[in-house]
Amino acid sequence: MALTKAELAEVLFDKYGVSKQDAKVLVEDFFEEIRVALERGEQVKLSGFGNFELRTKNQRPGRNPKTGEEIPISARRVVTFKPGQKFKSRVENAEPED
């Protein structure tokens, strides 16, 4: 099971009493701000949670798994996430729900 944006909006509705529409907008805007900051080349640091960063991966050699032929893997930008210490330890020590 995965936590979705709709479920996050539902939590805001249940916990804080904001309207369902406002909760949906808040969740969408939150993730949009993260995306825009990353597009501008900024790091996103969420205290107690972790850091998002846009990194550039250089071109590198690769191999076609079917033919074994060497092919270049083109340079690209990737989003990385590094969890914070508090977040990491809480998740590592959490008991999974059934």
Curated annotation (Swiss-Prot):
CDD domains: IHF_A. One of its GO terms (biological process) is regulation of translation. GO terms for cellular component: cytosol. Gene3D superfamilies: IHF-like DNA-binding proteins. One of its GO terms (molecular function) is DNA binding. Keywords: DNA recombination, DNA-binding, Transcription, Transcription regulation, Translation regulation. It holds the Pfam family Bac_DNA_binding. It comes from the Bacteria. The keyword DNA-binding applies. This protein is one of the two subunits of integration host factor, a specific DNA-binding protein that functions in genetic recombination as well as in transcriptional and translational control. This is Integration host factor subunit alpha. It comes from Idiomarina loihiensis (strain ATCC BAA-735 / DSM 15497 / L2-TR). The gene is ihfA.
